[in-house]
A protein has these predicted regions:
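C-terminal regulatory domains involved in ligand/effector binding and gene-expression control
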Residues: 110-282
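Conserved phosphate/anionic-ligand binding catalytic regions in large, soluble enzymes, centered on
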Residues: 41-59, 308-326, 367-377
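Accessory "access/gating" subregions that flank catalytic or transport cores
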Residues: 234-336, 340-354, 358-364, 368, ...
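C-terminal domain-closing interface element
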Residues: 98-121, 149, 374, 379-388, ...
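Non-transmembrane, aqueous-exposed alpha-helical and coiled segments at domain scale
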Residues: 12-33, 38, 42, 60-84, ...
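Alpha-helical support elements that line or immediately flank enzyme active sites
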Residues: 50-67, 324-336, 381-389
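A structured, mid-to-C-terminal "fold-capping" secondary-structure block
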Residues: 208-241, 245, 251, 414-485
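Hydrophobic alpha-helical bundle architecture
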Residues: 336-337, 348, 355-427, 440-448
Length: 485
């Protein structure tokens, strides 16, 4: 073994199991769903929630922790280092992970960072940036973000270690995990204390029973829990949902405004959203209009994600074209769905997303693309069903069908970029969501043989069994078989 290899392995977190004991506490002791809307729907720069938003949140958190260290420790500090492992190391270059991680160390947060700042960082890779800790100022650069080993028994496929360096050794080290959808955890993590949900549930069956017993919609049950757990008012929660809906609409509109152009990176992929949208408006193709409009909207938001522009995790950045496409189509079609109905749809989407996070995963590095596009499609199907006034059983059937027909989907991003096959997959995910809704509303409810809980368990089982080469490592599939010239 070379000295370089030995040095790399020495920095890697050593674990004897797939998950560390700390993460096992979180994963196995589930209890009821406790996730909140403002934790799930996040606004931030693309192209990846797990590889861009998550790492920026992690390094921002680490920087904030460092500012609270005793003055005598900070006096010995000489700099900051970040080590990326597993999938973060394997595909981080194409996901802009190093830029996101450095931005977090500089005090930038995903919700407020200017994407132009990240673009400038990419254009000037040798640039140094001052960061102040205590009485000291360090100059940081992309060289301080280290792509470490991709192979190992990591606590999570997206593992990072952040270090405050001294002259001879680290002064302070924290191990983190970007667990999907922009959510982060760390060694020793325990879920934050929250209020108690009004309606306790950890499965779709339990959630649906609450709705049916109390003559409520799925959206109403979720809203009641949001109020109880967060301590916020319905008015405050609705204001947040309006913000998310408007951000989704803006992302699609921005993507549709780009008439032509090549997306960043070596693939040289041309944007096509505007072209598909224009054809959808042509009377010659009226019979194709509904599908073409939804597909164009999904392409638009997904292309914005590929540009590193602002998107909304629903549930992830890689799948951020699906839900916005449905929202845009509902608002701008002849239906002209009201914002009140869209809010209800976003709550119904949360119900499905929460359960997938709770009982499976939202990270392609853990579950493949089924965990991203599949979950997004199921959330979108639930949104449509809620907006159209479907009952809880029909809503579940629609979400189940959408998720079922993404099971087994691999994540094999070409060249590590969230473009091929990711962008078109968002279009197919959105169209499948609509198809799932149509089937669910035209079948006899009681004859639907597969329930959502079984499908979510299958999602988790399939992800666990899937070869790691097909889980956001770019080591197989299209990533290996498509030649980039």
């Amino acid at each position: 073994m070379s000295n370089a290899s030995s040095a790399k392995e020495a920095t890697a977190p050593k674990m004897g199991a797939t998950l560390s004991p700390d993460l096992n506490v979180v994963k196995q002791s589930k209890g009821p769903v406790m996730t909140l809307a403002d934790e799930f729907y996040k606004v931030g720069p693309g192209p990846s929630s797990s590889h861009t938003i998550g790492p920026m949140r992690i390094t921002y958190d680490f920087y904030q922790r460092c500012t609270t260290l005793p003055a005598d420790q900070l006096a010995k500090a000489t700099g900051l280092k970040v080590h990326l492992f597993g999938s973060l190391s394997a595909t981080g270059k194409g996901h802009g992970t190093e830029h996101a991680a450095l931005a977090g160390l500089l005090g930038k947060e995903p919700a407020t960072v200017d994407p132009l700042f990240l673009d400038e960082m990419k254009a000037n890779p040798e640039q140094t940036y001052p960061v102040k800790l205590g009485d000291k100022t360090f100059n940081l650069s992309l060289a301080d973000i280290i792509y470490d080993t991709t192979k190992g028994d990591f606590p999570h496929p997206n593992t990072m270690t952040c270090k405050l360096m001294g002259r001879d050794k680290p002064i302070y080290v924290q191990e983190y995990y970007s667990v999907g959808g922009g959510f982060i955890e760390w060694k020793g993590y325990q879920p934050p204390k929250k209020g108690q949900p009004k309606y306790l549930y950890s499965t779709m069956k339990e959630l649906r029973q609450h709705a049916e017993k109390n003559n409520l919609s799925i959206a109403q049950v979720i809203m009641a829990n949001e109020v109880a757990v967060s301590g916020k008012t319905e008015k405050q929660i609705n204001a947040f949902l309006d913000k998310i809906a408007n951000a989704m609409l803006a992302t699609v509109k921005s993507g549709l405004s780009v008439k032509e152009g090549v997306l960043p990176g070596p693939i040289k992929l041309h944007s096509k959203a505007a072209t598909v949208w224009e054809r959808a408006q042509d009377e010659k193709y009226e019979s194709d209009r509904a599908i073409a409009m939804v597909a164009a909207c999904a392409l638009a938001a997904s292309e914005e994600n590929a540009r590193g522009h602002v998107v909304i995790t629903a549930p992830t950045s890689g799948s951020a074209g699906v839900m916005p496409a449905i929202v845009y189509a509902l608002v701008n079609s002849k239906r002209q769905v009201s914002m009140e109905k869209i809010r209800e749809g976003l709550l119904a989407g949360l119900a499905v997303g929460y359960l997938c996070k709770h009982n499976a995963t939202l990270a392609a590095a853990e579950g493949g693309c089924q965990s991203e596009i599949g979950v997004a499609s199921a959330m979108a199907a639930a949104l449509i069903a809620q907006v159209m006034g479907s009952n809880p059983q029909t809503l579940e059937n629609a979400a189940e069908s959408a998720l079922e027909h993404h099971l087994g989907m691999t994540c094999d991003p070409v060249a590590g970029y969230v473009q091929v096959p990711c962008i078109e997959r968002c279009a197919f995910g959105a169209v499948k969501a609509w198809t799932a809704f149509l089937i669910a509303t035209n079948e006899i409810e009681s004859r639907h043989r597969v329930d959502l809980d079984a499908t979510i368990k299958t999602l988790a089982d399939t992800g666990r069994d899937m070869n790691a080469k097909y889980k956001e490592t770019s080591e197989a599939g299209l990533a290996q078989n498509l030649t980039i010239c």
